[in-house]
Amino acid sequence: MKTIMVIGAGQMGGGIAQVAAQAGYSVILNDIKEEFVNRGFGIIDKNLSRSIEKGKLKAEEKDLILGRITKSISLQDAVSADLVIEAAIENMGIKAQVFSQLDVICPEHTILSTNTSSLPITEIAAFTKRPDRVIGMHFMNPVPVMKLVEVIRGLATSDEVYKTIEDLSLKMGKTPVEVNDAPGFVANRVLIPMINEAVYTLYEGIASVEAIDNVMKLGMNHPMGPLALGDLIGLDTVLSIMEVLHEGLGDKYRPCPLLRKYVKAGWLGRKSGRGFYKYDA
């Protein structure tokens, strides 16, 4: 394993590219527009500069890490990748298009992985002729800080591919946890319904935003309340994952009407300046 292509230069993709480059791999950072790639590269640059300020990294190490990252706006560049990690938006149609193209472009040995937080790996793998070499790698946000990677086998994922990705995750400084393919996997099957239930608690007038978050912080020792966490994740993302859970697992996972209303209003959390809390632009 020498070269890794990361598709999607946003918050997740940029973070994955950073930890891969820090682990010594050659990285191709890909997105559909040059401005997106440059923005992602700039965030990696800032993250590494912050590490230097904190004494966790030397200036010459930063230069070496950035030197391992190549910018790309063409999927054709995947022809030189040993592993592709797709970190595009959570949309099955887009993932289907990307994986079917990658299947044609990439050499036979290339492993195709997705950072999806909730979509079925088996279904994504079916868009390729190599389902045994398709696997889920669900990183947590922010990627450079969070240790967990959920490694999700599709129905056909081979043991050899799983072992390769497990070893790679360890080399990236992560802790891989094996998870079977089911809606939301483990992380979002547990976390997102908790946020949704907190929204229901607000919707039903049981307590205020601050009160709900304080109960979970002070009573359950959570570092952040569920409504503040929803704002951090993005309420559109929370709703999207709840829709996947609802479709796959039934009415128990129905999204709260208030969550739908906030998303329709454009109140998406921190990224839009308003969610359950207000934020400075």
Regions found by a protein language model. Give the residues of each.
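Helix N-cap / loop-to-helix initiation motif
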Residues: K33, K58, S158, A207-A211
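Rossmann-fold dinucleotide-binding core
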Residues: I111-N180, F185-R189
